[in-house]
């Protein structure tokens, strides 16, 4: 995998996108390009610059949410939360945003997933577990199991399953094959079980 080339393509897409009007669609594309650049740099071992790009992605996901007025675009707070977690940053503001938007009570499983991530970021593990058990229908069971786990062994088993399912996939956001969910869950585990 040529991570340098993937980074350069993503950075070029981001720079090109900044020259356009920043409507909702363009803001999502900017966020996705920043996400790809950050993950590519992470794979190159450049954690500092990866963090810059991942924080940029989180900011653009929030801007696109604010521009959209769509109360069910849950991928945006999820993207922001995961980007900040992987960057090693405090994701508390993004977590409060997701919860204030109603993620934990959302009708869709993906919305409730955003809520569970947000609750875990804020250290509200018991509440997160209660919401996580509602994800069963229409949601990847390995991710739901990891989110609901209250001990490190069960969590580790579930995250290993997430990694395994990642290896079986053939499509990835921005064509960047990085196990972002597992990386974010690893960060949460380091906070929950140590």
Which residues make up each language-model segment?
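Eukaryote-skewed repeat-based solenoidal scaffolds used as protein-protein interaction platforms
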Residues: 1-165
């Amino acid at each position: 995998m040529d991570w340098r080339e993937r980074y350069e393509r993503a950075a070029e897409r981001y720079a090109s996108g900044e020259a356009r009007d920043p409507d909702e669609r363009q803001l999502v594309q900017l966020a996705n390009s920043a996400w790809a650049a950050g993950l590519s740099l992470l794979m190159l071992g450049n954690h500092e610059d990866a963090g810059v790009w991942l924080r940029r992605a989180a900011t653009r996901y929030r801007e696109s949410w604010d521009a959209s007025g769509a109360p069910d675009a849950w991928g945006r707070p999820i993207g922001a939360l995961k980007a900040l977690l992987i960057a090693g940053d405090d994701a508390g503001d993004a977590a409060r945003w997701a919860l204030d938007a109603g993620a934990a009570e959302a009708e869709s499983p993906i919305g409730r997933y955003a809520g569970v991530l947000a609750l875990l970021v804020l250290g509200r593990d018991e509440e997160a577990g209660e919401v996580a058990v509602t994800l069963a229908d229409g949601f990847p069971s390995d991710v739901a199991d990891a989110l609901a786990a209250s001990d490190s062994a069960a969590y580790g088993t579930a995250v290993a399953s997430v990694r395994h399912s990642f290896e079986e996939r053939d499509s990835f956001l921005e064509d960047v094959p990085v196990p972002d969910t597992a990386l974010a869950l690893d960060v949460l585990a380091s906070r929950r079980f140590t």
